[in-house]
Amino acid sequence: VQAIYVPADDLTDPAPATTFAHLDATTVLSRQISELGIYPAVDPLDSTSRMLSPHILGEEHYNTARGVQKVLQNYKNLQDIIAILGMDELSEDDKLTVARARKIQRFLSQPFHVAEVFTGAPGKYVDLKESITSFQGVLDGKFDDLPEQSFYMVGGIEEVIAKAEKISKESAA
C-alpha cells in the first residue's frame, strides 16, 4: 500500500496521473465527502480497481458496482442544475436518481471499525453478499419509500429499515 500526495486534489496533475497508470487499484479520499460527514471518505467515482471485472467478481457484484457508480455519476452531473435551478426543476426521473444517489452516499457511510474515532459509532461487519443485495435493492427502488437519513451510519439493510421505522415513529409523536 502506497500513499500518493495529489497537489491541490487535482487527479489530472501529471505527477500523480502518471503514477496512477501503474497501479492495480486506487482509493481516493475526498474532502467533499468528508465534509458530508461520510467516513471513510472514499470517492467511489475516482477510486479504481483492475479487479472490477465480471470475470473476477462475478456478474451480480460487477453489475451492482457499476450501477452504483452510474447513479452517483448521474447525480454528480445534475449538481450544477440543482445549484442553479433547484430540485423542483428536475424531471421525475432525475429526482429519483438524486434520491437514490443520496441514499447510496449515506449507505456508504456504514460504520467501519477504522472510522470509529471519527464517528463515535461502533464498527459493524456487513457480509459482502448482503451488501451487494442491499445496493441492488436501492438501485431497483425497493427502498424508495425509506428516508435517506435512515441509510446514514448503519450496518446492513435491516438496520436501515429499523432506523426508518424509528424515524417514522418519532415524527408521528
Curated annotation (Swiss-Prot):
InterPro entries, alphabetized: ATP-synt_VA_C, ATPase_a/bsu_AS, ATPase_alpha/beta_chains, ATPase_F1/V1/A1_a/bsu_nucl-bd, ATPase_F1/V1_b/a_C, P-loop_NTPase
Source organism superkingdom: Eukaryota
Keywords: ATP synthesis, ATP-binding, CF(1), Hydrogen ion transport, Ion transport, Membrane, Mitochondrion, Mitochondrion inner membrane, Nucleotide-binding, Translocase, Transport
EC supergroup of this enzyme: translocase
Cited Pfam families: ATP-synt_ab, ATP-synt_VA_C
Major site of localization recorded for this protein: mitochondrion
Claim: Nucleotide-binding is one of the keywords in the record: yes
GO-annotated biological processes: proton motive force-driven mitochondrial ATP synthesis
GO molecular function per UniProt: ATP binding; proton-transporting ATP synthase activity, rotational mechanism
SUPFAM superfamilies with a match to the protein in the record: C-terminal domain of alpha and beta subunits of F1 ATP synthase, P-loop containing nucleoside triphosphate hydrolases
UniProt keyword Transferase, yes or no: no
Compartment list: Mitochondrion; Mitochondrion inner membrane
Assembly and interaction partners: F-type ATPases have 2 components, CF(1) - the catalytic core - and CF(0) - the membrane proton channel. CF(1) has five subunits: alpha(3), beta(3), gamma(1), delta(1), epsilon(1). CF(0) has three main subunits: a, b and c.
Record-given protein name: ATP synthase subunit beta, mitochondrial
Source species taxonomy: Eukaryota, Viridiplantae, Streptophyta, Embryophyta, Tracheophyta
Gene: ATPB
